[in-house]
Swiss-Prot record:
Binds 1 FMN per subunit. It comes from the Bacteria. This is Protein-methionine-sulfoxide reductase heme-binding subunit MsrQ. It comes from Pseudomonas putida (strain ATCC 47054 / DSM 6125 / CFBP 8728 / NCIMB 11950 / KT2440). InterPro entries: Fe3_Rdtase_TM_dom, MsrQ-like. GO terms for biological process: protein repair.
Length: 197
């Protein structure tokens, strides 16, 4: 296994935040609605991990270090893990497993549908993030995994729809996402190694 310490560091960071938030909830440090706080934090954590994942390719081009690419799949799976936990928090703490209420929520809060579409995209990416799928799909695998850009757009839209008024935090995430997209424009991507010199 290449770069085991780097992989271990990412694993520790990925585990650390949910464990810490659980501790805060157990100690009554998250206020009167800890379930919602945890749900929100997990959603932002997933978006953060997604942006970090998308930064791996530009970082590799800038530095020439292959370690960034090696951990990209691991980071992507953490995005999926955080989103699954985000959804579970919603189902248990917000919805109370009241499936009849779900239809009402979808009508009242269409941003949930946007989030669900993003989750489906992540599910496809997570299921196919393995060597078997790469061999099976061949050239189509790369095309399929461009779905991550749509997932980012859906995630940002979901976030924007929720915050509505105070857009400062959202704007930071959107700006970073926009920069990462610009760095993928072929002419810009080709120039990155030259900038590193």
């Amino acid at each position: 296994m290449r770069y085991p310490w780097f992989r271990l560091a990412i694993f520790i960071v990925g585990c650390l935040f949910p464990v810490w938030w659980l501790y805060e909830a157990a100690m009554n440090l998250l206020g009167p609605d800890p379930g919602k706080i945890m749900m929100d934090r997990l959603g932002l954590g997933a978006l953060t991990f997604l942006l970090v994942t998308l930064s791996m390719t530009p970082l590799q081009k800038l530095t020439g270090w292959s370690g960034w690419i090696v951990v990209r799949r691991q980071l992507g799976l953490w995005v999926f893990a955080y989103i699954v936990l985000h959804i579970l928090c919603y189902l248990f703490f917000i919805l109370g497993l009241d499936w009849g209420q779900l239809a009402v929520e979808l009508r009242k809060r269409p941003y949930i549908i946007v989030g669900a579409l993003g989750f489906l995209g992540l599910l496809v990416l997570a299921v196919t993030s393995n060597r078997y799928s790469q061999r099976r799909l061949g050239a189509r695998w790369k095309k399929l995994h461009r779905l991550v850009y749509a997932v980012l757009g859906l995630g940002l839209l979901h976030f924007l729809w929720i915050v509505r008024s105070d857009l400062r935090e959202w704007a930071i995430y959107a700006f970073i996402g926009a920069v990462l997209m610009v760095l993928r424009i072929p002419a810009v991507a080709r120039a990155l190694p030259k900038v590193a010199r």
